[in-house]
Regions:
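Pyridoxal 5′-phosphate
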Residues: 14-426
Length: 426
């Protein structure tokens, strides 16, 4: 992305992957010392993650010391403005972006809606966009509504057995040259497969189109180097990635500058403000710097190499994925071994997916979720805002799925516990 900071000075990582200390990781999350949560195992992380202590501390400090407008000529205001700028700068750096390529909004759903409205103003009737059958409705639906403006909507279909999005199917959708934009998920929240974002974005660019990536279900499992992925837009929710209630939207400048401003005054010249019609939540944005604090704390505890911010973030992302792969092993083995009792949607190989498991038992999922709660297991259930992929895979959305999701802070004991609970209730 334009304005990206160089990575000079970052040593090669080779095959070395940091091994995270579970005790140290959990020590960064106040939820693990909260008495009311002590007897629970959290497998509803796809709904929302616990917040790290740095985010909580920054949010509390802002409300206590700096809850003033950031444009004043007095010390509290100057500190508020400084912290707001620092949060934007540090979040951009850990994502491999320039500071003006990161925008914030109340949620990813809101950011997607605003972006879709900008695309609506940009495209002409008869031009086409591609959406997918894997879409989460919060991101996919606003783009589908562009049909009302005469934009042709093409759907990238899933394989009906696996949920996979094939490269060949995408290329067929692009071959007539009418497509201007492709919106797709990095990971579907019910299929769980990790899509090859770098390859897809390169294919889209060769076709003369722009790419919009829904990263909500991917970012909690390791923040991406968005600049390296080649996405023109990348959206994720900080609330699902250890942070506050903010949507983060990366926009490559060559794409952003083609889009009409959506700012309230219609005339903002700042790239990062052009897609924020509701104004800024200063406290929540400032607290996003806590994500960088957390990554740096993990990195410096486990490794002393002299990497830059993006390098530290990628080293920790690899460490998170490695730990999650280890945790997935026993659970995947159990699910595959019990195919006669439960169907796992998406791949059964840890290397191909994130640890978010949508399970179909052939019965309504909500009662099973309530029974698991009696075992001290927190899980999600229902259609998970993903009725399209569920229908495509033969699961009625009204029946729904049981959704188990773990993160790098999940313990081996938690995994054993959920397996025992599933075995008792399936």
């Amino acid at each position: 992305m334009g304005g990206r900071r160089p990575c000079a000075g970052r040593p090669p990582t080779g095959t070395y992957v940091i091994k995270l200390s579970l005790d140290f990781v959990r020590g960064q999350f106040p939820a693990f010392s909260e008495p009311s949560l002590r007897d629970w195992s959290n497998f509803d992380n796809a709904g929302e993650s616990y917040a790290c202590r740095y985010v909580i501390w920054r949010l509390h400090r802002t409300y206590r010391e700096r809850k003033v407008g950031p444009e004043g000529a007095f010390p509290a205001s100057e500190r508020a403005a400084e912290e707001l700028h620092d949060a934007r700068r540090r979040v951009a750096l850990i994502l491999g972006l320039g500071i003006d390529e990161v925008a914030f909004g109340p949620s990813t759903a809101q950011n997607a809606y605003v972006l879709a409205q900008a695309v609506r103003d940009w495209l002409r009737p008869g031009e086409a966009i591609v959406v997918t059958e894997q879409d989460h409705e919060a991101v996919g639906a606003p783009f589908r509504r562009l049909a009302q403006a005469g934009i042709e909507i093409r759907e990238w279909p899933m394989d009906r057995a696996s949920g996979h999005l094939s490269q060949a199917a995408l290329e067929r959708l692009l071959e007539d040259g009418k497509v201007r934009l492709v919106s797709f998920p990095h990971v579907s929240g019910v299929v769980g497969e990790i899509n090859n974002v770098k390859r897809i974005c390169a294919t889209v660019r060769r076709a003369g189109a722009f790419s919009v990536v829904d990263g909500v279900a991917a970012a909690p499992h390791g923040l991406p180097d968005i600049g390296a992925l080649g996405a023109d837009a990348y959206l994720f929710s900080a609330a699902k990635a250890f942070g506050p209630h903010q949507g983060v939207m990366a926009l490559r400048q060559v794409f952003a500058r083609r889009l009409p401003t959506q700012a309230a005054n219609g005339a903002s010249e700042k790239d990062w403000m052009r897609f924020t019609p509701a104004g800024l939540d200063h406290a929540q944005i400032s607290a996003c710097a806590g994500l960088a604090d957390y990554i740096d704390t993990l990195y410096h505890h486990h490794d002393k190499s002299g990497r830059d911010a993006a390098g530290r973030a990628q080293a920790i992302s690899k460490a998170m994925r490695a730990r999650e792969a280890t945790l997935m092993g026993p659970l995947l083995e159990y699910l595959v071994g019990n195919r006669h009792r439960v169907r796992l949607l998406g791949p059964a190989q840890a290397r191909a997916r994130t640890p978010t498991f949508a399970l179909d038992t052939g019965r309504p999922a909500a009662p099973l979720a309530r029974r698991l709660a009696e075992h001290g297991i927190m899980v999600g259930s229902g259609e998970c805002h993903a009725p399209r992929p569920l229908r495509a895979l033969g699961v009625p959305p009204e029946r729904g799925v049981l959704r188990l999701s773990l993160l790098h802070y999940t313990s081996e004991a938690d995994v054993d516990r959920v397996i025992q609970a599933l075995d008792a209730e399936l």
